[in-house]
Amino acid sequence: MTDNTPLTLAAITGAHGVRGDVRLKLLGEGLEALKAHSSFNEGTLTLKSVRSDNKGGAIARFAEVQGREQAEKLRGTTLTVPREALPPLEEGEYYFADLIGLDAVTDAGKRVGKVIDVHNYGATDIVEIAKDPVPEKGMKTFMVPMTTHAVVEWNGERIVIATDFAHPD
């Protein structure tokens, strides 16, 4: 994908302590990618420090945040950087944000849903897909590993899943 859409590296989930630190949910690229940047959201937030919370997230301090009350107001804020600030992708690589929102179809051409999230539990990335159509009892999802056996191809418009990995109704 070659658009200019900023990429989200983390989301603020709440305050941590009384000095204005915030808890972060790391998205896709992890703590090291976050540490590589000092400015987020077009310069509105300046990172002073960041460390692991030892639970898969992080604790960060921003120069503009002076106390718990200000930190709480940032809950739900995503931390974005310009796409050009990240390293170029090699063949077969992707940013999580590039997959989210893609239509999901089987290799037989049947539309099965839309990518709503990407997870990584250590072994490989896992794509979470919301089924089409949304059932009366609420959204149903299924997960597919981002392996060559499960995901046949992807581009800026869709992700193609091997039929064996597309969960039937």
UniProtKB/Swiss-Prot annotation:
GO terms for molecular function: ribosome binding. Gene3D superfamilies: PRC-barrel domain, RimM. It comes from Erythrobacter litoralis (strain HTCC2594). Belongs to the RimM family. Binds ribosomal protein uS19. The keyword Heme does not apply. Pfam families: PRC, RimM. It comes from the Bacteria. One of its GO terms (cellular component) is ribosome. The keyword rRNA processing applies. The PRC barrel domain binds ribosomal protein uS19. Keywords: Chaperone, Cytoplasm, Ribosome biogenesis, rRNA processing. It is found in: Cytoplasm. The lineage of its organism: Bacteria, Pseudomonadati, Pseudomonadota, Alphaproteobacteria, Sphingomonadales. An accessory protein needed during the final step in the assembly of 30S ribosomal subunit, possibly for assembly of the head region. Essential for efficient processing of 16S rRNA. May be needed both before and after RbfA during the maturation of 16S rRNA. It has affinity for free ribosomal 30S subunits but not for 70S ribosomes. This is Ribosome maturation factor RimM. Its main location: cytoplasm. GO terms for biological process: ribosomal small subunit biogenesis; rRNA processing.
